[in-house]
Amino acid sequence: MFYWILLALAIVAEITGTLSMKWASISDDNTGFILMLVMISLSYIFLSFAVKKIALGVAYALWEGIGILLITLFSVMLFDEALSTMKIAGLATLVVGIVLIKSGTRKPTKQPKEQAHATV
C-alpha cells in the first residue's frame, strides 16, 4: 500500500509541475519555473521509490496516463484550453488502456518452499 501512495504522490507532483510550467509561460513570474523544477524532480523521486514494489510498466503507465488525463482536464479548467472531440476520444482510449493495464497485472503467487529432507 505504501508504494501505491508513493505512486499517487508522484502523479500529483507531475501534474503540479506540468501545470506550473504552463502558468510560468503565461506569467512574468519565475516562481512557476522554480515550482516546476521542484515538483517534477519530486515526481521522479517518488516514482523511483514506487517501482521498488510496483511493476515498472504498470507504474509508468499509470503515472503518465493519469497525469495526461488530469493535466488535460485542469488545463481546460484553469487555462481555458480547448477540448475537441478528438481529444475526448483520445482521453477515453487512455482511460480504457489504464484500466486494461491495471487489470492485467496480477501479483505473483508465492510457491510454498519445499522442505529439505534429511538423508542418512
Swiss-Prot record:
One of its GO terms (cellular component) is plasma membrane. The chain crosses the membrane at residues 1-21, 31-51, 54-74, 81-101. HAMAP family: MdtJ. Belongs to the drug/metabolite transporter (DMT) superfamily. Small multidrug resistance (SMR) (TC 2.A.7.1) family. MdtJ subfamily. This is Spermidine export protein MdtJ. Its main location: membrane. Forms a complex with MdtI. Catalyzes the excretion of spermidine. GO terms for biological process: glycine betaine transport. Keywords: Cell inner membrane, Cell membrane, Membrane, Transmembrane, Transmembrane helix, Transport. GO terms for molecular function: amino-acid betaine transmembrane transporter activity; antiporter activity; choline transmembrane transporter activity; spermidine transmembrane transporter activity. The lineage of its organism: Bacteria, Pseudomonadati, Pseudomonadota, Gammaproteobacteria, Enterobacterales. It comes from Enterobacter sp. (strain 638). It is a multi-pass membrane protein. It is found in: Cell inner membrane. The keyword Membrane applies.
